[in-house]
């Protein structure tokens, strides 16, 4: 595998915790899912500790920090509570995301351009404890350029509009936006990741984009795991991504 065809898979295990929290039980354990994902080829584990604690809990994050063999990508809102927690646990990677209590999942990208100083301060605090920071943003040139200005080393492009496109023409337009976003981010020296809404039937065109470093995928893998098991679900997704990346 050459550097050009290398692509990483970050497995988001939030929805394993969603199933647990639905009944207030101790199972299924997202930590076990994370370890299974690593054994199946995941390059990292993503968790989002939301303000309302609807799925992942602080204990999950603390245990994962101690047991992961790969790395944790800690998704977090830009709040003092989350910044203080991240400074305590020192995740290898952290991703700043927008967050609203009423949303089912993260609905759009972070408005970096509209709050540059606030984001710059958060990036500095996280970098000071050794965490590589990415910003979850729409594939919008204004937001990509702002991300570079605030000092973030990485961005994660929101692929939700591509994933939700209702016809082939719209999907093609949104895929082109992602392609252009990747190219711009790379030209500015940013590491470019992507994710949101990706599944087994739409991941390949995104994985084939030259310059994408990593895809973060969760819901589709957790859903597929109900039928084939967690390790198999992760392995199938990784295989699709690697096959697509060879076409770059």
From Swiss-Prot:
Q: Where does 3-amino-2-oxopropyl phosphate bind?
A: 12, 23, 197, 218-219
Residues noted as binding 1-deoxy-D-xylulose 5-phosphate in the record, renumbered to the chain: 14-15, 50, 55, 105
Active site, per annotation: 48, 75, 196
Subcellular localization(s) per the UniProt record? Cytoplasm
What are its GO cellular component terms?
cytosol
One example of a Gene Ontology biological process annotation: pyridoxine biosynthetic process
Q: Which reaction does it catalyse?
A: 3-amino-2-oxopropyl phosphate + 1-deoxy-D-xylulose 5-phosphate = pyridoxine 5'-phosphate + phosphate + 2 H2O + H(+)
Keyword annotations for this protein, in alphabetical order, are: Cytoplasm, Pyridoxine biosynthesis, Transferase
Q: Say if the entry is tagged with keyword Cytoplasm.
A: yes
Site positions (Transition state stabilizer) are 156
**Protein's pathway:** Cofactor biosynthesis; pyridoxine 5'-phosphate biosynthesis; pyridoxine 5'-phosphate from D-erythrose 4-phosphate: step 5/5
Write the Enzyme Commission number(s) for this entry.
2.6.99.2
UniProt keyword annotation of ATP-binding present: no
GO MF, one term, reads: pyridoxine 5'-phosphate synthase activity
Family classification:
Belongs to the PNP synthase family.
In UniProt terms, what function does this protein have?
Catalyzes the complicated ring closure reaction between the two acyclic compounds 1-deoxy-D-xylulose-5-phosphate (DXP) and 3-amino-2-oxopropyl phosphate (1-amino-acetone-3-phosphate or AAP) to form pyridoxine 5'-phosphate (PNP) and inorganic phosphate.
Quaternary structure (record): Homooctamer; tetramer of dimers.
Record's NCBIfam families? pdxJ, PRK05265.1-1, PRK05265.1-3, PRK05265.1-5
What is the recorded name of this protein? Pyridoxine 5'-phosphate synthase
Per the record, the gene is pdxJ
């Amino acid at each position: 595998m050459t550097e050009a065809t290398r692509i990483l898979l970050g497995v988001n295990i939030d929805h394993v915790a969603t199933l647990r929290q639905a009944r207030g039980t101790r199972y299924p354990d997202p930590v076990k899912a994370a370890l299974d994902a690593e054994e199946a080829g995941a390059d990292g584990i993503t968790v989002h500790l939301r303000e309302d604690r609807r799925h992942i809990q602080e204990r999950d994050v603390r245990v994962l920090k101690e047991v992961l063999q790969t790395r944790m990508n800690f998704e977090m809102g830009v709040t003092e509570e989350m910044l203080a927690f991240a400074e305590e646990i020192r995740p290898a990677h952290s991703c700043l995301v927008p967050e609203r209590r009423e949303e089912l999942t993260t609905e759009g990208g972070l408005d970096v351009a509209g709050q540059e100083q606030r984001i710059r301060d958060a990036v500095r605090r996280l970098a000071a404890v050794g965490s590589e920071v990415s910003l979850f943003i729409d594939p919008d040139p204004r937001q990509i350029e702002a991300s570079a200005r605030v000092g973030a080393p990485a961005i994660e492009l929101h692929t939700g509009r591509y994933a939700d496109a209702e016809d082939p023409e719209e999907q093609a337009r949104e895929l082109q936006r992602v392609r252009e976003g990747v190219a711009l981010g790379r030209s500015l020296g940013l590491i470019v990741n992507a994710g949101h809404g990706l599944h087994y039937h739409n991941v390949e065109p995104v994985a084939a984009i030259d310059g994408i470093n990593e895809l973060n995928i969760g819901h589709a893998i957790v859903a597929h795991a109900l039928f084939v098991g967690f390790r198999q679900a992760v392995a199938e997704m990784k295989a699709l991504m690697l096959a697509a990346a060879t076409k770059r």
